[in-house]
Every structure is written in structure tokens, then in C-alpha cells.
């Protein structure tokens, strides 16, 4: 077994019949074909619904390392569906994924996903359960004729990068200490409550002294 990451370098003492227990990878090409056939079978089975599955929300990756990027999440939160005017049980039937555990921590993400839901709803061609008796909200016969199965992802998410022009670095930027500033900001956030408590106690003591 090859050494992995920054662990201790092992001294493997192979006493058992280890050559029979070596993990092989001979099924990789056949597995690739099997996955492709399964994707095609699923696309045929769920047609004319999108082959890639339901609509996913735009979420920001966690941690400082990746939070500049956005990607597809698991499902839309209940608040997003409520603002968009879609019932949580209806959402799953019209190709919208729902994740009741997700919470919206900022207005920007909520608005972006509500807009995404509204855009999807406007583009959606909804087939009636009974072709002879279409209900309110179902697409017209002309729209149904135009319906084709979408092969790629539904409303793909793209990371947009704004290119900055080259310019001269200012003296203020040269003197700015990024790491120290981040440490200070974290410390201030951590000690905010303790400092507020101490300030309150000090103010109370001053009032008592004046009395």
C-alpha cells in the first residue's frame, strides 16, 4: 500500500499470501460503459423530463478556502419556495429539489434562488396528468409539441470572474498587513461579548462610587 498524505512511513511486513489480496482496477473500462448505459436508460425512463434530474439551488462553498465559488446545492429551502410561491409538495412533482434542512443566512442567497425558481417556472412546459382534461397551470397543446428532453444540467451554474486591470500598488496597500488584520478581526469578534460585559460592570462600579 502506497504512503498517503503526511502520515508515518510504514514498514509493511507481508507474511500472509498478500499477492492474492492486491486491489486491482481491471473493471474500470467496463464500469464506465455500465454507468453510461445506466444514464441512457434513466433518460429514456424519465423522458421528457430533464435527463440530469431536478433543478438545484445556487449555494456558496463553505470555508475561507472555497467561499469565492458557487456550486449546485442539494435542494431549495422551504423559505425560498415560500417566497417564490411554490408549495413544497408541488415542487418535487415539477422537477424542483427540496431540502428542508437548509437555512438562508443572507438575503442575497435567498433572492438569487427565488429568482432562479421564478425563471425555471416561466420556462417550464408542464404536461397534464390527463391529456383530455388539462388543469390550470398546464401547458398548451402547441407548447407540448415543442417539448424536447434536456440532456445537460438544468439552468447550469457558472462562476463569473471580473478581470481587474493592472495598476500601480499604493503605499497604503504596501503597508497593509492582511494576516494581522484577519487575526485582529477574529479576536475582536471572539472577545466582543466579554469586553461588553466588562465595560458594563465598570460603568456600574463608577455609578456606585459616585453615590
From Swiss-Prot:
Electron transport in keyword set: no
The UniProt record lists the keyword S-adenosyl-L-methionine: no
Source domain of life: Eukaryota
Any one GO BP annotation for this protein: translation
Keyword terms: Acetylation, Cytoplasm, Isopeptide bond, Phosphoprotein, Ribonucleoprotein, Ribosomal protein, Ubl conjugation
Residue list for modification Phosphoserine: 52, 77
Molecular function per GO: RNA binding; structural constituent of ribosome
Covalent crosslink: Glycyl lysine isopeptide (Lys-Gly) (interchain with G-Cter in SUMO1): 174
Residues bearing PTM N6-acetyllysine: 16, 177
Positions bearing the Glycyl lysine isopeptide (Lys-Gly) (interchain with G-Cter in SUMO2) cross-link: 123, 145, 174, 177
PROSITE patterns, per the entry: RIBOSOMAL_L13E (PS01104)
Subcellular location: Cytoplasm
Segments passing through the bilayer: none
GO cellular component annotations of the record: cytosol; cytosolic large ribosomal subunit
Family label: Belongs to the eukaryotic ribosomal protein eL13 family.
Function: Component of the ribosome, a large ribonucleoprotein complex responsible for the synthesis of proteins in the cell. The small ribosomal subunit (SSU) binds messenger RNAs (mRNAs) and translates the encoded message by selecting cognate aminoacyl-transfer RNA (tRNA) molecules. The large subunit (LSU) contains the ribosomal catalytic site termed the peptidyl transferase center (PTC), which catalyzes the formation of peptide bonds, thereby polymerizing the amino acids delivered by tRNAs into a polypeptide chain.
The protein's assembly and partners: Component of the 60S large ribosomal subunit (LSU).
Protein name per the record: Large ribosomal subunit protein eL13
Species assigned in the record: Bos taurus
